[in-house]
Amino acid sequence: MLGIETTCDETAAAVVSRDSDGKGHILSNVVRSQTDEHAIYGGVVPEIAARAHVEMLDHLIDAAMREAGIDYAALSGVAAAAGPGLIGGVIVGLTTAKAIALVHDTPLIAVNHLEAHALTPRLTDAIDFPYCLFLASGGHTQIVAVAGVGDYVRLGTTVDDAMGEAFDKVAKMLGLPYPGGPQVEQAARNGDATRFAFPRPMQGRSDANFSLSGLKTAVRNEIGRLESVSEQDVADLCASFQAAVLESTADRLRVGLDLFEQRFGAPTALVAAGGVAANQAIRGALDDVAQAAGTRLIVPPPALCTDNGAMIAWAGAERLALGLVDGMDAPPRARWLLDANAQVPGKFANTRAGF
């Protein structure tokens, strides 16, 4: 299965295989990050991202096929992320996949980008359903019950900012380079996490939703109170912000796991995916939550937590095994709910949160 990923600022192509027993193998996984193109703007510029996908995608697909050592006739299908994401990039990837499928008379699978994240641990760790997914990235923050391929129940979501977006915005306030998440984590190692008393959003609530906009505002207010911001101030602000995120996340996940068990029984694992899962402090907090809940934590390797083609190819292979294929009229989608019956929590609606 060839997989194509172009939903944000990574251009990626990969080839994976799936055995009859469900075991997966990555034959190639080629990713070209656009970080340098967007760094000078302090964030992703959709038009620049789409143009970069156009320039790079054909070359990356060729490289992935060569590395896998197969030709197009050997493909069982072509999978592309059809959303949710920046619509220009989604169109580039999906249109390319349609062309390949049409020319080589092979099935097309239009993959939900979030489903690809959700199914990645079945590629890396061959885990059984049902499991609890914590997906945290620059565009999404969700707790999802993964009951089967195509069977997802969202237990909690952010009502405003995504977690990765909050890290990036705090980094920008403090003058740290883009992408900001790793910069905040690094600065926090040298900081005093108790210096600034930031709020712990949503803590103690009976639902499993997240909120990060108020915490982000609290950081901005503290910066404004400082006459000048020293290197130590930056470290202390980052450490205090990250500590608040950790405590809030742990609380939300404890509630999410309780909701999971009420509906599905004990999960086979707590799984973390998305770029935020690369943060070692957050991994530590997740591990503590998993142990307290009597389950294990599974985090795919960093290269498979962030956006990549292998996860798209694997989701395509899982869907193809169930006979789920798409026609040439499969639409690109800027918004695409993972769980078809999901309701926006309360009055909130935020495209970046995945609604």
Swiss-Prot record:
Keyword Transferase included in the entry's annotation: yes
Catalytic activity: L-threonylcarbamoyladenylate + adenosine(37) in tRNA = N(6)-L-threonylcarbamoyladenosine(37) in tRNA + AMP + H(+)
Subcellular location: Cytoplasm
Cofactor(s) the protein needs: Fe(2+)
Gene3D superfamilies named among the record's database cross-references: 3.30.420.40
Recorded superkingdom: Bacteria
EC number(s) on file: 2.3.1.234
Cofactor binding mode and count: Binds 1 Fe(2+) ion per subunit.
Keywords per UniProt: Acyltransferase, Cytoplasm, Iron, Metal-binding, Transferase, tRNA processing
Listed InterPro entries: ATPase_NBD, Gcp-like_dom, KAE1/TsaD, Peptidase_M22_CS, TsaD
SUPFAM superfamilies, A to Z: Actin-like ATPase domain
Function in brief: Required for the formation of a threonylcarbamoyl group on adenosine at position 37 (t(6)A37) in tRNAs that read codons beginning with adenine. Is involved in the transfer of the threonylcarbamoyl moiety of threonylcarbamoyl-AMP (TC-AMP) to the N6 group of A37, together with TsaE and TsaB. TsaD likely plays a direct catalytic role in this reaction.
Family: Belongs to the KAE1 / TsaD family.
Name of the molecule in the record: tRNA N6-adenosine threonylcarbamoyltransferase
Organism annotation: Bradyrhizobium sp. (strain ORS 278)
Gene that encodes the chain: tsaD
